[in-house]
Amino acid sequence: MVDAHTHLDACGARDADTVRSLVERAAAAGVTAVVTVADDLESARWVTRAAEWDRRVYAAVALHPTRADALTDAARAELERLVAHPRVVAVGETGIDMYWPGRLDGCAEPHVQREAFAWHIDLAKRTGKPLMIHNRQADRDVLDVLRAEGAPDTVILHCFSSDAAMARTCVDAGWLLSLSGTVSFRTARELREAVPLMPVEQLLVETDAPYLTPHPHRGLANEPYCLPYTVRALAELVNRRPEEVALITTSNARRAYGLGWMRQ
């Protein structure tokens, strides 16, 4: 299995040894690769180093939409340098977050987020790397910017949590939907009803660790080793065997991120 989106630094990793420890725990649960994702410039530097420390780790770099105010000319130049690294496999996470403005001190305003999102879209197109989207309560805004700018060849909706209408739009566009532990939450009714509409060939699985720990460990700290719980919940919703879902989503991740051959 491939954890298509995680945050090893937020899980407590600091150096090569602590990265290896997290990845070894994941490997023992059948997770053979992880994509660790940046949310600011400091973490973009860190995830790139982490991907050099262990061959099972890959990186994605961008500024999180809530931090879009920090996208200065200097930040753009550094992100362009980092995204060219061969171990960086995606531009992300970027997008639009309409939940935090007004709730989180220092959160970028929506118009600033839109401008930063457009820049990251262009970066993904220029580099040929997948675009990894953070969308929180912003379906219409995300679609508006993607349509205005033109989507890259590969688009990944990280931690997809929208309804059936948004799922159909994304599927019809050929985008990938990455599902987290949220699919195991009985309270996530709209998402769980939307999942059967998603072709498994367009699905990825992720932990978004240390957040969104899947059932039955909800409320505890999440790590990449918890990914099989999400795979089992997803398998139940699409009426497939967990082993089959693991195989297909691993193949999807390999293709999307250009990971090459690896064990499922």
Curated annotation (Swiss-Prot):
PROSITE patterns per record: TATD_1, TATD_3
Organism superkingdom: Bacteria
Cofactor: a divalent metal cation
Molecular function terms, GO-annotated: DNA nuclease activity; metal ion binding
Pfam families: TatD_DNase
InterPro entries xrefs: DNase_TatD-rel_CS, Metal_Hydrolase, TatD-like, TatD/YcfH-like
Protein residues bound to a divalent metal cation 1: H5, H7, E93, D208
UniProt cross-references to CDD domains, sorted A to Z: TatD_DNAse (cd01310)
Record key words, sorted: Hydrolase, Metal-binding
Main enzyme class: hydrolase
SUPFAM superfamilies: Metallo-dependent hydrolases
Classification via PANTHER family: D-AMINOACYL-TRNA DEACYLASE
Family as reported in the entry's similarity comment: Belongs to the metallo-dependent hydrolases superfamily. TatD-type hydrolase family.
Protein's name according to its UniProt entry: Uncharacterized metal-dependent hydrolase TatD
Taxonomic source organism: Mycobacterium tuberculosis (strain ATCC 25618 / H37Rv)
